[in-house]
Amino acid sequence: MFLLPRFVLVSCIIGSLGFENPPTNVVSHLNGDWFLFGDSRSDCNHVVNTNPRNYSYMDLNPALCDSGKISSKAGNSIFRSFHFTDFYNYTGEGQQIIFYEGVNFTPYHAFKCTTSGSNDIWMQNKGLFYTQVYKNMAVYRSLTFVNVPYVYNGSAQSTALCKSGSLVLNNPAYIAREANFGDYYYKVEADFYLSGCDEYIVPLCIFNGKFLSNTKYYDDSQYYFNKDTGVIYGLNSTETITTGFDFNCHYLVLPSGNYLAISNELLLTVPTKAICLNKRKDFTPVQVVDSRWNNARQSDNMTAVACQPPYCYFRNSTTNYVGVYDINHGDAGFTSILSGLLYDSPCFSQQGVFRYNNVSSVWPLYPYGRCPTAADINTPDVPICVYDPLPLILLGILLGVAVIIIVVLLLYFMVDNGTRLHDA
């Protein structure tokens, strides 16, 4: 209690000397228990294989290349690997998770399932996917991919119905129509199995519109049934549009178990890959760095939409991405953001990373770690120190109670002494 006035005085002196400790626009970590998922901008192996080895290709400091804390692949992303044949097995584990990827599936790629489809739907899918990834990696240490085995008792094989350019969808798989069916008004099932992970992120997708085939329109209908628990997950087409729709996906977080994929109309879909989530941890917000092209290419903001507090902190540069290796690789602003991975930091917040945990000019929003509890507000004339009022209020109450007790005791002894004098 006697130290509080000294603390106030010292803090005010520090404030008067201009110590502000503002939040910095970087991603960092509390300690060495961290991991980064990325693409070419943090893919050290890709740089090693170029000639010459030009590290200006990356936004990552090359001193981190041998840290063992990076899973990155040039030309890829977690979303791209999840849905398409262009696959990289992103794998990593840490208490503090950082993502700097996503640019390799943007409106620039203009993906849509059919010629009359919609890339806007796929951007929506991307946002929903990363929302699940970020939320779950705030409570899980480990992320990797696993194959999902399935058994279909018919003779039809999976078909590459959904493709555009070099991208071919293979998760979920489409099971082609059986030869003895004259149309798509039929019910069909397949078993699939999830095992070996704590939980899984799997896709459940439908064409949300009137799907035309041979002059007939069909409403998509897909369900997953957990045979162990009896829980059913399903989607039915609700739109009446006949053009401009595409493959709408929901991303389910499922436990291990035996499942049944069911289609009541159109083609059966069944998951073939899943995000494997392992090793529950104490809640730790993930950090996401905006992943975008130079303005010459069209980007999207889906990782920003997916990254929301309290489970996620989003970091971005205020300027156009302009690389030094080429316009899309080696930007100074994003290199600065990733430079925070070179050191530990005590406090993370929505506004940025705090380098010190004593006082700050900014109150941390959605704080995590050992964060400043006071703010130093500099006016043009004199520094004014503002502190958490609770300790001062409690101190005032205690002092008030002490004063009252002292006054009561003084009155008591004065009255008692006067009475005894009178009696004498």
UniProtKB/Swiss-Prot annotation:
Cysteine pairings via disulfide bonds: 44-65, 113-162, 197-276, 205-249, 307-312, 347-371
Spans annotated as Esterase domain 1: 7-127
Bilayer topology annotation: Single-pass type I membrane protein
Source species of the chain: Bovine coronavirus (strain G95)
InterPro entries linked to this entry: Capsid_hemagglutn (IPR008980), HEMA (IPR042545), Hemagglutn-estrase_core (IPR007142), Hemagglutn-estrase_hemagglutn (IPR003860)
Carbohydrate attachment residues: 54, 89, 153, 236, 301, 316, 358, 417
One Gene Ontology term, aspect cellular component: virion membrane
Virion surface side: 17-392
Transmembrane regions listed in the UniProt entry: 393-413
Topological domains, Intravirion: 414-424
Function: Structural protein that makes short spikes at the surface of the virus. Contains receptor binding and receptor-destroying activities. Mediates de-O-acetylation of N-acetyl-4-O-acetylneuraminic acid, which is probably the receptor determinant recognized by the virus on the surface of erythrocytes and susceptible cells. This receptor-destroying activity is important for virus release as it probably helps preventing self-aggregation and ensures the efficient spread of the progeny virus from cell to cell.
A biological process term (GO) from this entry: fusion of virus membrane with host plasma membrane
Matching SUPFAM superfamilies: SGNH hydrolase, Viral protein domain
Subunit structure: Homodimer; disulfide-linked. Forms a complex with the M protein in the pre-Golgi. Associates then with S-M complex to form a ternary complex S-M-HE.
Protein name listed in UniProt: Hemagglutinin-esterase
Annotated spans, Esterase domain 2: 267-379
Pfam family, any one: Hema_esterase
Location(s), subcellular: Virion membrane; Host cell membrane
